[in-house]
Design a protein with these regions (language model features):
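C-lobe helix-loop cap of protein kinase catalytic domains
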Residues: 28-33, 120, 124
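The conserved phosphate-sensing helix
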Residues: 21, 30-46, 78-82
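Extended charged low-complexity segments that act as oligomerization/scaffolding linkers
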Residues: 28, 35-38, 128, 147, ...
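Conserved small helical "lid"/interfacial subdomain of P-loop NTPases
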Residues: 1-25, 31, 42
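Winged-helix-like regulatory helical subdomains adjacent to P-loop NTPase cores
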Residues: 49-122, 137-138, 142, 150, ...
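A short, conserved structural fragment
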Residues: 122-135
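Extended amphipathic alpha-helical scaffold segments
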Residues: 96-97, 111, 132, 149-408
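An amphipathic alpha-helix signature
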Residues: 6-14, 71, 113, 145
Length: 408
C-alpha cells in the first residue's frame, strides 16, 4: 500500500476523528510519515490526552506499532546487522556503487563491504529494505526508518550520532539535517533532546577548532542547539565589520520587492528578541543589505500559522524594536525600512511559505484574527506612521502605503 500524502492524512484525521486543529494535524502528519494506521493511533492519543505534548514524543506509539515486528526480525540479532539497518535508515537511500563516503560506518561496525551487502540481503528478506536493480537500497517504511535511527544512533549508540553528523555533514548535508530534524520533532522527549544536543555539540566543538569555514556552515544549520553562543559569535562578527556608506534612497524597491533572497547567515538568525538587536545593528552598518533584511522580516517575522496562537508576540516585539531605533524619524535608514515592513504587516491576509518534508513546500492562506495582540501591534504601527508623516521626506512613502492598504 502506497503511503498516504500529507493531505490524505489530514483528511483522514478530519473525517474520522474530527481533528481540525492545524497544529495537531501538522504534528500527526509529521510523525506518521504517510502511515494511516499510525496517524489514527496518534490522533486517538491526542484526543484522549487533549494536549499537544502527548504527541510530541511518540516513542510509545512507535514501540507498540513496530516493536514486535523489529524485535522478531533484527533487533534480537547482532549489532552489525542492526547497525547496517540504521545506516540505511539514516541515509534513506544508498547506492552500493557509491559507498565510499560510508566506509567510516563500516569501520565503526568492524565489517567490510561484503558483510554489509550480506546484511542488506538479509534485511531485504525480512522486508526492512527494498533493493532496486541490485544496486540501490531504500528503507521500506519511513516510520520503521525513524525507529531504527533512534534505536541505533541515540538509544544504543551502536554508532554515535556525532560520528555520523561529523563525517557526513559535507558530503550528505541534506540527510544529516533531515535526520536530526526528525529526531527532535518526532521523538521530542527531554532524554532524546539532550542526547541529540550533546552529540551535535561534540561536532560543533570539533569544527570550531578545526575548520572555520565549515564551522560557519554548521552553525547556520544547527544554531538552535546553542542559540546563546550563536548570538555571541554573530555579535562579535558584526562588531568586527567596518561598516559602509550607502544611499538607501537609491534602492529600487518596486523592482526588487518580489525577488526574495535571504542568504546571509546573520540575517537568517531567528532567536527573538536578541536576534532583532543583531539584525538592526547589522543593518545600521550595512544599509546596502536593505532588501535582504526586508525579506528576512517579511519571511520570518511576519504573520505565520502560529501567530494567532502566540497572540502576535513576534510582531509586537518587532514593531517595538523599530520604534526604539527610528528615533522619531531621525534615523532615515531605519525609518524607511519600517515603512516598507509596515506595508506587509498591515495586510489582512497573509500567504507564508514553509519548507515541508523531503524537499516539499507548504503554502498557507492565513487571515488576520482580531485579538488583543493583533490590535496592539497594528496600533503601534499606525502611531509610528503618524509620527513619521510629520517629516516631509516620508510623506510620499506613507501615502503610497495608504493607497496599497485601501486596495486590500
Amino acid at each position: 500500500v502506497a503511503p498516504f500524502s500529507d493531505e490524505q492524512i489530514k483528511a483522514l484525521l478530519e473525517q474520522n476523528l474530527e481533528i481540525f486543529n492545524h497544529i495537531f494535524t501538522r504534528q500527526i502528519t509529521r510523525i506518521s510519515e504517510g502511515n494511516a494506521r499510525l496517524a489514527v493511533l496518534a490522533g486517538k492519543l491526542a484526543l484522549d490526552k487533549r494536549t499537544l505534548e502527548s504527541i510530541r514524543d511518540v516513542s510509545g506509539i512507535y514501540e507498540s506499532y513496530y516493536g514486535d515486528f523489529l524485535n522478531g526480525r533484527i533487533l534480537n540479532q547482532n549489532n552489525n546487522l542492526i547497525g547496517c539497518a540504521g545506516i540505511i535508515a539514516f541515509m534513506n537511500v544508498i547506492n552500493l556503487s557509491e559507498m565510499g563516503s560510508l566506509d567510516f560506518c563500516l569501520e565503526e561496525l568492524g565489517i567490510d563491504r561484503k558483510r554489509f551487502e550480506d546484511c542488506v540481503r538479509y534485511l531485504h528478506d525480512q522486508e526492512i529494505v527494498d533493493i532496486y536493480h541490485n544496486q540501490v537500497i531504500k528503507i521500506s517504511d519511513q516510520c520503521v526508518g525513524n525507529y531504527l535511527v533512534k534505536h541505533v544512533f541515540v538509544d544504543e549508540q551502536i554508532i554515535p550520532l556525532s560520528t555520523m553528523v561529523g563525517n557526513l555533514f559535507v558530503t550528505r548535508k541534506t540527510a544529516v539535517v533531515e535526520t536530526v530534524s526528525m529526531l527532535t520533532h518526532v521523538f521530542a522527549s527531554p532524554d532524546v533532546m539532550e542526547k541529540v544536543r550533546r552529540e551535535i555539540c561534540l561536532v560543533w566543538d570539533e569544527l570550531q577548532q578545526a575548520d572555520k569555514t565549515l564551522f560557519r556552515e554548521f552553525v547556520k544549520m544547527f544554531y538552535a542547539f546553542r542559540p546563546v553562543e550563536t548570538l555571541i559569535l554573530l555579535n562579535d562578527e558584526i562588531d568586527s565589520l567596518p561598516g559602509e556608506e550607502f544611499d538607501i534612497d537609491e534602492v529600487d524597491f518596486a523592482q526588487k520587492r518580489n525577488h526574495i533572497s535571504v542568504n546571509d547567515e546573520i540575517v537568517n538568525i531567528r532567536e527573538l528578541p536578541e536576534a532583532l538587536d543583531l539584525l538592526f545593528e547589522y543593518y545600521a552598518k550595512y544599509p546596502s543589505k536593505f532588501m535582504e533584511i526586508y525579506h528576512a522580516i517579511t519571511r520570518y517575522l511576519s504573520i505565520d500559522k502560529d501567530s494567532h496562537t502566540n497572540d502576535y508576540w513576534t510582531q509586537i516585539q518587532l514593531v517595538s524594536k523599530f520604534q526604539q531605533d527610528i528615533e522619531n524619524g531621525l534615523n532615515h535608514n531605519m525609518s524607511l525600512l519600517f515603512i516598507r515592513a509596515a506595508s506587509e504587516l498591515l495586510k489582512l491576509e497573509f500567504s507564508p511559505v514553509e519548507a515541508g518534508k523531503h524537499n516539499t513546500v507548504i503554502f498557507y492562506d492565513i487571515p488576520l484574527v482580531v485579538t488583543e495582540g493583533s490590535k496592539t501591534y497594528r496600533s503601534m504601527i499606525w502611531e509610528t506612521l503618524q509620527t513619521l508623516y510629520n517629516h516631509e521626506r516620508y510623506r510620499s512613502y506613507i501615502e503610497a502605503l495608504l493607497v496599497e492598504y485601501s486596495n486590500q
